[in-house]
């Protein structure tokens, strides 16, 4: 399996009592109808670590139904130990997802040997296609490229790696060393176009929640060799990504993330995102006003 294109890491709307599954269905339907190559609801953007295992399964059941074979359905484990990870992979397999993204161990900063041992224990019990993942903003460490290389060489079910490090030198290493064997996928919207130009296969991104077909257009332009046009579109969106970064997305995970993505989705599409799931705080009024200003300047609202 070769993963290519734009996979939407979707936001999760809530009610005061739980997940707003009807709202989720609307979000997923818009993305599938727009022509995105895949959906990834139980993601960091989708607040996977704040969902119960039962909620994660139901979210993926909705995604599987909405996708209807028109888009890949990818599930994220959101777990930090091998036993819980194996359990979530089993549950997702029963749902019939296409690919599972393995959340790396978090809370403790692990060394190479511990990370490698974690992957071996999980993959020895896993036969579904798997994406490996690095997100040092959440785990406190970046997974060495060599660890991914070792794991990919040992386990044929590993089909890709998602990079949310924000470290472009590291990303280039992934493309150079693993790009012939695995699909290298960018995890930050701000770096999507530069990554594609340098040989990445696609991205797992939050922008599709509220950007319409813009992210797909970026992908198309690069693939057609229209690099200057892709860069121009990228630069047009930079005020948005710089604002998102300034509010905690890049550099550290601030308390305003991913609520800004949810607010943007609500402002653009009119879908009630409901309250953030605690302990995430609501977006402050000053940030809401700034986001509204940027979205208006982009012609999105």
UniProtKB/Swiss-Prot annotation:
GO terms for molecular function: 2-dehydro-3-deoxy-phosphogluconate aldolase activity; 4-hydroxy-tetrahydrodipicolinate synthase activity. It is found in: Cytoplasm. Its main location: cytoplasm. The active site is at residues 44, 107, 133, 162. It is an enzyme of class 4 (lyase). One of its GO terms (cellular component) is cytoplasm. It comes from the Archaea. The keyword Lyase applies. Its EC number is 4.-.-.-. Keywords: Cytoplasm, Lyase, Schiff base. Homotetramer. Belongs to the DapA family. This is Uncharacterized DapA-like lyase Pars_0992. The lineage of its organism: Archaea, Thermoproteota, Thermoprotei, Thermoproteales, Thermoproteaceae. The gene is dapAL.
């Amino acid at each position: 399996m070769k993963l290519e294109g734009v996979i939407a890491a979707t936001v999760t709307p809530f009610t005061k009592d739980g997940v707003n599954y009807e709202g989720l269905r609307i979000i997923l339907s818009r993305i599938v109808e727009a022509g995105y190559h895949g959906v990834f609801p139980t993601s960091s953007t989708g607040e996977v670590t704040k969902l119960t295992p039962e909620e994660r399964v139901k979210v993926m059941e909705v995604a599987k139904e909405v996708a209807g074979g028109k888009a890949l359905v990818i599930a994220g484990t959101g777990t930090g130990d091998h036993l819980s990870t194996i359990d979530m992979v089993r549950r997702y397999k029963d749902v019939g997802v296409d690919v599972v993204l393995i959340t790396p161990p978090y809370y403790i900063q692990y060394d190479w040997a511990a990370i490698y041992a974690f992957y071996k224990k999980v993959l020895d019990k896993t036969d579904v296609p798997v994406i490996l993942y690095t997100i040092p903003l959440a785990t406190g460490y970046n997974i060495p490229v060599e660890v991914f290389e070792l794991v990919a060489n040992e386990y044929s079910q590993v089909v890709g790696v998602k990079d949310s490090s924000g470290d472009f030198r590291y990303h280039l290493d992934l493309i150079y060393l693993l790009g012939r064997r695995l699909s290298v996928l960018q995890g930050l919207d701000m770096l999507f176009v530069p990554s594609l130009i340098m040989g990445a296969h696609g991205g797992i991104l939050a922008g599709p929640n509220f950007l319409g077909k813009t992210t797909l257009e970026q992908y198309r332009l690069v693939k057609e060799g229209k690099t200057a046009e892709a860069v121009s579109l990228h630069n047009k969106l930079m005020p948005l990504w710089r604002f998102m970064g300034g509010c905690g997305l890049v550099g550290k995970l601030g308390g305003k993330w991913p609520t800004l993505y949810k607010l943007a989705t609500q402002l653009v599409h009119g879908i009630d995102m409901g309250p953030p799931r605690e302990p995430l705080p609501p977006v402050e009024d000053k940030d809401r006003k700034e986001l509204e200003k940027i979205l208006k300047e982009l012609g999105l609202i």
